[in-house]
UniProtKB/Swiss-Prot annotation:
Protein name listed in UniProt: Molybdenum cofactor guanylyltransferase
Location relative to the cell: Cytoplasm
Keywords: Cytoplasm, GTP-binding, Magnesium, Metal-binding, Molybdenum cofactor biosynthesis, Nucleotide-binding, Transferase
Tagged with keyword Metal-binding: yes
GO terms assigned for molecular function: GTP binding; metal ion binding; molybdenum cofactor guanylyltransferase activity
Role this protein plays: Transfers a GMP moiety from GTP to Mo-molybdopterin (Mo-MPT) cofactor (Moco or molybdenum cofactor) to form Mo-molybdopterin guanine dinucleotide (Mo-MGD) cofactor.
Length: 204
């Protein structure tokens, strides 16, 4: 397994929040705290350092007490732009990402992904969940925004984005990757609308 001190965590909070009406998703309150804070608190014990990627409300994110990195690619270019911002500031061999709108980040995410990456000799490790399809049969669902990445891939990601690439699954497919099955699909649930946020808060 890769030592905790060799991993930097990155909370991805740089999106437009368009499905939430343009609000900053990471700052929406869930169970008394911003969603990004929930993700941060669950990821922090698993890594040696933590960053937040954000493109607005920077002072609010800086108040969380960790460094904030801004996309170098303009116009809200998607999660890969945030990942590149993290890789450019990362001082460790590996970067572990999680989205700001997933308040139940698994507490064993780093351990399981790093073990699989080391054993497979891969450069990227991603979780996979099994979720029912329309017929109730289990369907594999890759969760690429939760990924452990070899920080040496920063230059390749820069090139991919400069060439107009934006799809995270297309970029990860360029590199040796390993997938790790997690049983708790709900731990990877992301909240896309204010209605979903209210519903989840009522259930918890």
């Amino acid at each position: 397994m890769i030592p905790t001190s060799d991993i930097t965590g990155l909370i991805l909070a740089g999106g437009r929040g368009s499905r939430m009406g343009g609000v900053d998703k990471g700052l929406q309150v869930f169970n008394g705290a911003p969603m990004a804070m929930h993700a941060l608190m669950r990821l922090s014990p698993q890594v040696g350092h933590v960053l937040i990627n954000a493109n607005r409300n920077l002072a609010a994110y800086e108040s969380f007490g960790v460094p904030v990195v801004v996309d170098a690619v303009p116009d809200f270019a998607g999660p890969l732009a945030g990942i590149l911002a993290g890789l450019e500031q990362c001082q460790t061999p590996y970067l572990l990402t999680a989205p700001c709108d997933s308040p139940f980040v698994p507490t064993d995410l780093a351990a399981r992904l790093s073990t699989a990456l080391a054993e497979a000799g891969a450069r990227i490790a991603m979780p996979v969940t099994l979720e029912p399809d329309e017929n109730g049969r289990p369907r594999r669902q890759v969760q690429p925004v939760f990924c452990l990445i070899d920080a040496a891939l920063a230059d390749d990601l820069t090139t991919y984005l400069q060439q107009g690439g934006r799809k995270i699954d297309a970029w990860t497919a360029r590199h040796p990757s390993v997938e790790v099955v997690f049983d708790d699909a709900a731990a990877f649930a992301n909240i896309n609308t204010l209605a979903e946020l209210r519903q989840l808060a009522e259930r918890r």
